[in-house]
Amino acid sequence: YGNPVDPSVSGNMSRWTTCGFFGRLNYDYQGKYLFEVNGRYDGSSRFRPGNQWKFFPSVSAGWNIAQENFMQPINDWIGQLKLRVSYGNLGNQNVGTYQTYQTIGVYANNGTWLQDGLKPMTAWAPGLVSQNLTWETIQSFNVGLDFAFLKDRLHGSFDWYVRKTKNMIGNAPELPSILGTAVPVTNNTDLRTNGWELTIGWNDRLSNGLQYGISLNLSDAYATITRYPNNPSHSLGNYIEGQRIGDI
């Protein structure tokens, strides 16, 4: 009864490889002066040879002011007062598995005509690709302060940061439709994010032994497009250089 059902089977397989090396150097002088250097060397098969490997360094330093000798008389009131600063790079392989290679898609039961009562298998000609795609790079700069007062009952931290995302994957400038295919994506977009975060907490114990804690978190951030060449006419329906994400 009812309409017959034609069973179909579909499948997909892809393969890609990553490899990375990581190193870290720490220095701590009497808990007052802190220094750290990191290095990453990452590779991905999603890019062509020559663009597969990239080095991503980072560095951070801290000064625990509360451990200085001139702070000893008020250590009961100020248990921690640490200033932090850091700068670093990370990579993002934000591309498809075979996006730098021309591939032919094959689809079963996909034709608009029938052969022996069944839709035939179809294949699509490959489009244009960019052979120069490479890693997106996220550059982060952060300044922070950790504090704890009143025998660590009042504690918190404040961070101010700037994060720049370089060489994001974006659409290339449009070409005439007579080309007959879509324009490939390229590393042509940059984004800058500015923000801050504040965390304040209070932990204490009542006279009956009951412990309690409360915390408050505040944050704000905005992102600005600093490079986007695919909208030279500044069309409102597309991203614009200098525009803040989310602006109306």
Which residues fall in each region the model found?
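Extracellular/periplasmic, surface-exposed regions of secreted and cell-surface proteins
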Residues: Y1-I248
